[in-house]
């Protein structure tokens, strides 16, 4: 990965939180749209590399409630600075669509792709997708708090083809900065970002579920989960594959993540033993 231009993706992963937080937890509990019976969450930001079909998490950051999105991105990129990775393209989801983030990415000269949030009934960004054609244009977004920023928008018509039960033509709008790509290739390219969501699902298979009130312990458990997923990717590419013309042939179905976790569990049990009995308390006489 070092000294090469890489495609990176940044995203936020929300883990539901229930109950009343202790004082040491409060800085890490954020509020978001209700999900799984709660609107309180621990939030973890990750940066993910997509290289030669390999998907690996490079950095993890526990988000504080008062942190801005620009601060979150900065902390993640600082963590991987010693890898000397040049960013070929940065993928972000619509949660990062705001004036400060776009202005900061442009100021840092970082190439990126990000969906536009469509708002308004006729004007605003709604008007961008109502022209019913594929095109490029510039757009200025205004914020009462942060001022304004002008950026390039690409609007592309795509067919749903039955995905999620939807059919027909729809138009997508993206913020694009210094991306060397044909306009019609953009939706397919951006879809690569969704591998980060699959990494979250894999991470959940490995994550230690806990009720601890210690934010550091929670971060440790999430970090271990991502490391286990990275280990699995390494094993697949190194030992569960064969070289061939056009790229390595992977046999991922022969060694799913669950199997690796079972192997690890068996190794731990052989090392420290397993509990096979319990003892009832002795009767206490008064």
PLM region descriptions:
Residues 179-189, 204-222, 239-243:
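Short, solvent-exposed helix-loop connector elements
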Residues 108-205:
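An anionic, glycine-rich sequence signature occurring as long contiguous blocks
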């Amino acid at each position: 990965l070092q000294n090469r231009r890489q495609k990176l993706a940044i995203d936020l992963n929300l883990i539901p939180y229930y109950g009343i937080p202790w004082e040491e937890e409060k800085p890490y509990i954020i509020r978001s749209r209700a999900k799984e019976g709660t609107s309180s969450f621990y939030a973890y930001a990750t940066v993910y590399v997509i290289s030669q079909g390999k998907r690996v998490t490079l950095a993890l950051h526990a988000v504080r409630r008062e942190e801005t999105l620009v601060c979150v991105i900065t902390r993640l990129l600082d963590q991987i600075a010693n890898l000397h990775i040049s960013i070929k393209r940065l993928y972000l989801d619509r949660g990062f669509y705001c004036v400060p983030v776009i202005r900061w990415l442009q100021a840092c000269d970082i190439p990126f792709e990000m969906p536009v949030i469509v708002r308004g009934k006729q004007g605003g960004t709604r008007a961008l997708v109502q022209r019913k054609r594929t095109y490029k244009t510039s757009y200025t977004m205004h914020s009462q708090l942060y001022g304004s920023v002008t950026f390039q928008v690409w609007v592309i018509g795509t067919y749903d083809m039955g995905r999620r039960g939807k059919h027909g033509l729809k138009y997508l709008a993206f913020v694009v900065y210094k991306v060397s790509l044909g306009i019609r290739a953009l939706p397919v390219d951006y879809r690569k970002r969704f591998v980060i969501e699959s990494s979250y699902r894999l991470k959940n298979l490995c994550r230690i579920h806990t009720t601890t009130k210690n934010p550091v312990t929670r971060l440790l458990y999430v970090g271990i989960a991502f490391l286990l997923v990275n280990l699995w990717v390494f094993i697949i590419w190194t030992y569960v594959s064969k070289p061939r013309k056009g790229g390595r042939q992977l046999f991922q179905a022969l060694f799913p993540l669950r199997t690796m976790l079972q192997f690890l569990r068996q190794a731990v049990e052989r090392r420290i033993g397993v509990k096979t009995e319990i003892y009832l308390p002795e009767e206490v006489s008064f």
